[in-house]
């Protein structure tokens, strides 16, 4: 079992912890998250970005992690970035908690996400269905109030 964690921080009061676990390269990865400080009762874009660089805030994280050169999509779509995790839903206090199981996100192997970044966006991800070029790249999910680098843990 390989385990990783990303501690999300940013300048907008959004923060949280994301843990990832994968038993083997063939198995799906379980992603557990608890993120506070978002708007209440909202959906926010949630992605893994290419770089583990947060030196200039979350902008330094680069684009969505996309080793297979696909367009942006929903987590269940065949055509999607590896980093496309869809939206997280917040409760009345602005806290999002949940578990995602994803077969494209890997901690083991050549497309591992270890060392990359998890980013929470300020807007809702349109899942590539927005009908414009930006939708096919980012889902029009907007600014990046919080991010964290994915690192191995025990």
UniProtKB/Swiss-Prot annotation:
Enzyme Commission identifier(s): 1.15.1.1
UniProt biased composition (Basic and acidic residues): 125-136
Cofactor: Cu cation; Zn(2+)
One Gene Ontology term of the molecular function aspect: copper ion binding
Catalytic activity line of the entry: 2 superoxide + 2 H(+) = H2O2 + O2
Oligomer and partners: Homodimer.
Name of the protein: Superoxide dismutase [Cu-Zn]
Lineage: Eukaryota, Fungi, Dikarya, Ascomycota, Saccharomycotina
Gene that encodes it: SOD1
